[in-house]
């Protein structure tokens, strides 16, 4: 298991806050308050992995979750590509580099790594907004919301090391 090194947060106003965690104790009480707060929407892209890391290392639930990968798979059934890079290109019309996706984020971050981290979150609000429009138009919003309810259970199954699809025959 890779350690949780950093968390990126954006309010959707082109800002990005990159929080590097103290891996000796993972003490981040203000961050935990934000993550647990039901009044603050947390938008992820493939939240399953991130939420598992957060729960494992920060010992907190992440509440009021949205997930652009799940939304994309339900809204964009015309496509097999649901990567964040693809969604940024389709909805924001920007090509972002994923060169630093597999980087060491545990040390001092270079300007290029910081830009990569920021790009990972600054577009999520707009993408979520656009995907929500499609989900509503295609009458799949309720299905999406039900998937989000199950996401925490899927995370708990992952943390309990149930790697098999328990729904398969």
Where are these regions (language model features)?
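Conserved RNase H-like, two-metal-ion catalytic cores of nucleic-acid enzymes
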Residues: 1-86
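Generic structural signal for hydrophobic core residues of well-folded globular domains
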Residues: 10, 38, 74-75, 91, ...
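Residues that form generic nucleotide/phosphate-binding pockets
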Residues: 34, 57, 87-91, 134, ...
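Short aromatic/hydrophobic-glycine micro-motifs
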Residues: 40, 92-94, 140
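A broadly conserved amphipathic alpha-helix scaffold signal in soluble, globular proteins
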Residues: 52-55, 85-89, 122-129
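A polyampholytic, Gly/Pro-enriched intrinsically disordered region
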Residues: 82-96
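Acidic, Mg2+-coordinating catalytic module of metal-dependent nucleases/exonucleases
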Residues: 96-156
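Long, charged alpha-helical interface segments
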Residues: 149-169
């Amino acid at each position: 298991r890779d350690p949780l090194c950093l968390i990126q947060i954006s309010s959707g106003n082109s800002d990005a806050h990159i929080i590097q965690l103290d891996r000796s104790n993972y003490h981040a009480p203000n961050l935990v308050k934000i993550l647990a707060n039901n009044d603050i929407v947390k938008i992820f892209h493939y939240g399953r992995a991130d939420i598992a890391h957060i729960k494992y290392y920060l010992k907190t639930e992440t509440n009021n979750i949205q997930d652009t990968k799940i939304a994309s798979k339900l809204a964009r059934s015309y496509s097999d590509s649901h990567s964040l890079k693809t969604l940024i290109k389709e909805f924001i019309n920007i090509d972002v580099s994923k060169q630093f996706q597999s980087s060491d984020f545990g040390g001092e971050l270079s300007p290029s790594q910081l830009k990569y981290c920021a790009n990972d979150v600054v577009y999520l609000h707009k993408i979520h907004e656009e995907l929500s429009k499609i989900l509503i138009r295609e009458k799949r919003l309720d299905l999406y919301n039900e998937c989000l309810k199950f996401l925490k259970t899927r995370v708990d199954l992952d943390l309990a090391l149930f790697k098999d699809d328990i729904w398969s025959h």
